[in-house]
Each structure stands twice: as C-alpha cells, then as structure tokens.
C-alpha cells in the first residue's frame, strides 16, 4: 500500500477508498498488477486528507458507497466542492444508490463485477481526464 506522502506519478495515481480491508487489498492488488500507482484510504476523511496531500498526483478516485461516518456520496460531494474535473468511480452493491450521485459527474458501478472491469473503469477515467486537461 502507498501511504500518505508516498509518491505516485503525476495525475496517474488511483486513490482507492473502502472501509472493508479485504476488498481494499483485492482491488489494490488488481490495480497494481495492471500497472497503476495506488494509494488507499479506509474512511472518507482520510481520503480527503490524502487527496489534499497528493492533489497533483491523483488522477482518479475509486470509492465504495457504504462506509461508516461519511458515505461515498458525502465524499463525492466534498470532492466536488473543490474539484469538478477529477474522475470519480463509485462502487456499490446497492444499484438503487445511484440516485444519490445524480448531477455529481461520477461513474457508478454496481458490485460484483470482474477485476478486468475495474481496470477498464480506471483506465478510461484517466484517459478521459487527460483528454479534458489537454483540451483546456
């Protein structure tokens, strides 16, 4: 796991947020094996702190929907209050939770899904962000 302050490539890092340690480790391993630089957080508050510390290195946030203290939708709203361009992928076992993210410009994916789909979601989100930055 990459902790706070450890370097990842500029705007190509993945901030992975999940309170479930097993899910976090599995997704981190999948993304690392695919060549991504990954930093992890287990709460929305720690994710926000890491995002501030690594703002110039994180290119996409992948978060779970259900977490203690602050939900994925609360995390997304906090990120969107400061950053409209950062791609965010929300993962949830509750497809009906999609409504909580309307208007927040996220990719919502119902769980479960194959590891290859996570890789493609991250890759396409990073590619889209790079195109948007290039057009700006």
Annotate each predicted stretch with a short phrase.
Residues 1-15, 21-28, 52, 56-57, ...:
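Non-catalytic signal-transmission and effector/linker regions of two-component phosphorelay proteins
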Residues 21-39, 106:
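Two-component/phosphorelay signaling modules centered on CheY-like receiver
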Residues 35-43, 50, 87:
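Short hydrophobic/Thr-rich beta-strand motif most characteristic of the beta2 strand and flanking loop
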Residues 42-46, 71-75:
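Acidic catalytic/metal-coordinating carboxylates
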Residues 64:
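Active-site residues of response regulator receiver
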Residues 67:
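Receiver (REC) domain active-site loop signature in two-component systems and cognate sites
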Residues 91-92:
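Hydrophobic/aromatic residues positioned on beta-strands within the core alpha/beta folds
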Residues 111:
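A Lys-centered signature of the CheY-like receiver
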């Amino acid at each position: 796991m990459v902790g706070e302050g450890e370097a990842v490539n500029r705007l190509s890092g993945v901030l992975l947020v999940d309170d479930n340690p097993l899910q976090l480790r599995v997704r981190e391993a999948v993304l690392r094996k695919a060549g991504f630089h990954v930093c992890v957080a287990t709460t929305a508050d720690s994710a926000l702190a890491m995002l501030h510390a690594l703002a110039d290195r994180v290119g996409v946030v992948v978060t779970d929907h259900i977490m203690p203290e602050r939900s994925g939708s609360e995390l997304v709203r906090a990120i969107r209050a400061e950053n409209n361009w950062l791609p965010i992928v929300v993962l949830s076992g509750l497809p009906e939770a999609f409504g909580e993210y309307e208007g927040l410009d996220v990719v919502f994916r119902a769980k479960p899904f194959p590891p290859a789909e996570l890789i493609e979601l991250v890759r396409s989100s990073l590619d889209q962000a790079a195109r948007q930055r290039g057009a700006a």
